[in-house]
Amino acid sequence: MTADTQIPRATAQRLPIYYYYLSSLHEAGIKRINSTEISEAIKFDAATVRRDFSYFGALGKRGFGYDVSALLDFFSKVLSQDKLNKVAVVGTGNLGQALMKYNFVHSSNIQIVMGFDVDPKKKELKIDNEKGETIPVYSIGDLKSELNKENVTIAILTVPGKSAQEVTDQLVDAGIKGILNFSPIRITVPNSVRVQNVDLTTGMQTLIYFVDNFENIKSAK
């Protein structure tokens, strides 16, 4: 893969799924796997798996499949697993605090290092996470200075919709390059900033629809 290689967004979103599945195979001592086996395990069709992998060149061999260790090492580099990504949570209500306590305990390259809130009562709040670390919470007024101190370029946004865009503008001004957006609105950012929206309500409503209409969807295939 070269720096000019264009990877579709859908493919990029599947890469962590491939990585964690390959990690589980490696831990289980499995040496080799083919696209059909990957497909059956993670519920993507085999053609999608092969197409996703093809964007990165020749990762496997016809008749042999894929070497698990080599493939895991490759995706580890693609996903920058050897680089520590410092993250800030903006909005330390119930959801924000839950994320800070969890702190991506099963990931070695993601670390929430600070939180921010508009409530002055939370300024001295410290959150103990599942990794045994204590995460400080700062005033939103200290956003830019604290982010710059720790070279944080990724933020998780868990503020109410009415303040989401204003806070987003502050994050962009502070140099944030990526935002995981849990707020109920679609925020606007410059082209240089990436946003991943997480809408729990929409996801649940979609799930309910599929549960209620399972037979109709099944028969339409």
From Swiss-Prot:
<comment type="similarity">
    <text>Belongs to the transcriptional regulatory Rex family.</text>
</comment>
<dbReference type="InterPro" id="IPR036390">
    <property type="entry name" value="WH_DNA-bd_sf"/>
</dbReference>
<protein>
    <recommendedName>
        <fullName>Redox-sensing transcriptional repressor Rex</fullName>
    </recommendedName>
</protein>
<keyword id="KW-0804">Transcription</keyword>
<feature type="binding site">
    <location>
        <begin position="91"/>
        <end position="96"/>
    </location>
    <ligand>
        <name>NAD(+)</name>
    </ligand>
</feature>
<dbReference type="GO" id="GO:0003700">
    <property type="term" value="F:DNA-binding transcription factor activity"/>
</dbReference>
<dbReference type="GO" id="GO:0051775">
    <property type="term" value="P:response to redox state"/>
</dbReference>
<keyword id="KW-0805">Transcription regulation</keyword>
<dbReference type="InterPro" id="IPR022876">
    <property type="entry name" value="Tscrpt_rep_Rex"/>
</dbReference>
<dbReference type="InterPro" id="IPR036291">
    <property type="entry name" value="NAD(P)-bd_dom_sf"/>
</dbReference>
<dbReference type="Pfam" id="PF02629">
    <property type="entry name" value="CoA_binding"/>
</dbReference>
<dbReference type="GO" id="GO:0045892">
    <property type="term" value="P:negative regulation of DNA-templated transcription"/>
</dbReference>
<keyword id="KW-0678">Repressor</keyword>
<dbReference type="Pfam" id="PF06971">
    <property type="entry name" value="Put_DNA-bind_N"/>
</dbReference>
<keyword id="KW-0963">Cytoplasm</keyword>
<dbReference type="InterPro" id="IPR009718">
    <property type="entry name" value="Rex_DNA-bd_C_dom"/>
</dbReference>
<dbReference type="GO" id="GO:0005737">
    <property type="term" value="C:cytoplasm"/>
</dbReference>
<dbReference type="GO" id="GO:0003677">
    <property type="term" value="F:DNA binding"/>
</dbReference>
<keyword id="KW-0520">NAD</keyword>
<dbReference type="InterPro" id="IPR003781">
    <property type="entry name" value="CoA-bd"/>
</dbReference>
<comment type="subunit">
    <text>Homodimer.</text>
</comment>
<comment type="function">
    <text>Modulates transcription in response to changes in cellular NADH/NAD(+) redox state.</text>
</comment>
<dbReference type="InterPro" id="IPR036388">
    <property type="entry name" value="WH-like_DNA-bd_sf"/>
</dbReference>
<feature type="DNA-binding region" description="H-T-H motif">
    <location>
        <begin position="17"/>
        <end position="56"/>
    </location>
</feature>
<keyword id="KW-0238">DNA-binding</keyword>
